[in-house]
């Protein structure tokens, strides 16, 4: 059963207070103007409108039934498959070597604060935009190292995703990669440069890294099997922000609030866990995304805890230790 039919089956057909499906043509023209869309032909424009209309219907249904809110945004004329193919990039091969040490977190969660967020301690760097390059794995990996550097040295830095795309021969650049193999590649490369020394191009290119300009070096990496989702709270406070794998299909049109309904049809995107809290008696996780600050809650999103939202527990969480 697809996700739209699931919502209809459980809740019935509803109307959104914010959007009216009958006004889809008007919304679409506003969308085309706002995002400067040029489809090249009326045939292609009509095709995009039909996709837009389908996405609008999903937005309306979700807005009525989820605690989060969804909106028409820059992805609204793309099918979910197109968005996943162009704007994510997590690849999950059938088998990978355990270069990073695997740790099983099988003890019950400890007693910690009800709320915690590394952003409040100024240990999370600015939200970036990967664009149409499947390098979420590089962004999430380096975002965790940027935070580790900030925790250790009290300084925010901006590391080079382009170096990872060009010089990480374990992963596949804009064609995808994995979190733990990215850490493996950094250890093998010897370190990572600043983005200012190796700027982002959103495309695969020849490796041009300068080992004399490495700012961050990784000495160890770990993968965690979490028996209890709540155990991630202890891990987050202990090691810093954690890169994790999710299925991004249900967050594409997200605007704000806590997502209660995020299914997992296959992991495809890497994001960074930065905090957790409680709002209106709903416990949530906070993630940093890589789709720019014009998406979601200024580039961040929240999901309900303890429901394996977006499949967040289906792949091992990965972290690394810097020198």
Curated annotation (Swiss-Prot):
Keyword Membrane listed: no
Keyword Lipid metabolism assigned: no
Annotated catalytic residues: 136, 269, 289
Signal peptide: 1-16
GO biological process, one term: proteolysis
EC number per UniProt: 3.4.22.50
UniProt-recorded Gene Ontology molecular function terms: cysteine-type peptidase activity
Disulfide bond residue pairs: 133-174, 167-207, 262-310
Propeptide: 17-112
Residues carrying sugar: 158
Reaction(s) catalysed by this chain's protein: Endopeptidase of broad specificity, hydrolyzing substrates of both cathepsin L and cathepsin B
Pfam families referenced in this protein's UniProt entry, alphabetically: Inhibitor_I29 (PF08246), Peptidase_C1 (PF00112)
Function: Cysteine protease that plays an essential role in host liquefaction to facilitate horizontal transmission of the virus. May participate in the degradation of foreign protein expressed by the baculovirus system.
Protein name as catalogued: Viral cathepsin
Organism: Rachiplusia ou multiple nucleopolyhedrovirus (strain R1)
């Amino acid at each position: 059963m697809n996700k739209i039919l699931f919502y209809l089956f459980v809740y019935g057909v509803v109307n959104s207070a914010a959007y009216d499906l009958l006004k889809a043509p008007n919304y679409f023209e506003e969308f085309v103007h706002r995002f400067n869309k040029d489809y090249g032909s009326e045939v292609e424009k009509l095709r995009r409108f039909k996709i837009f209309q389908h996405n609008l219907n999903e937005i309306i249904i979700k807005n009525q039934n989820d605690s989060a809110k969804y909106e028409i945004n820059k992805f609204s004329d793309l099918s979910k498959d197109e968005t996943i193919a162009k704007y994510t990039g997590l690849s999950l091969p059938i088998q990978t070597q355990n270069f990073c040490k695997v740790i099983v977190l099988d003890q019950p969660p400890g007693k910690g604060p009800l709320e915690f967020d590394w952003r409040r301690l100024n240990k999370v760097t600015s939200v970036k935009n990967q664009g149409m390059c499947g390098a979420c794995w590089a962004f999430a990996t380096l975002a965790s190292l940027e935070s580790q550097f900030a925790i250790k040295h009290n300084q925010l830095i901006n590391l080079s995703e382009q170096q990872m795309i060009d010089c990480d021969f374990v992963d596949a650049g804009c064609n995808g990669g994995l979190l733990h193999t990215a850490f493996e590649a950094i250890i093998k490369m010897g370190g990572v440069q600043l983005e200012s020394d190796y700027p982002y191009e959103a495309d695969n290119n020849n490796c041009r890294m300068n080992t004399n300009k490495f700012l961050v070096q990784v000495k160890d990496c770990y993968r965690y099997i979490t028996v209890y989702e709540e155990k991630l709270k202890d891990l987050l406070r202990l090691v810093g922000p954690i890169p994790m794998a999710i299925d991004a299909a249900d967050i594409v049109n997200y605007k704000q609030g806590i997502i209660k309904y995020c299914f997992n049809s296959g992991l495809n995107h890497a994001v960074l866990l930065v905090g957790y809290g409680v709002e209106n008696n709903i416990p949530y996780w906070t993630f940093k995304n890589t789709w720019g600050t014009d998406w979601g809650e200024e580039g961040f999103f929240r999901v309900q805890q303890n429901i394996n939202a977006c499949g967040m527990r289906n792949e091992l969480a990965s972290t690394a230790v810097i020198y």
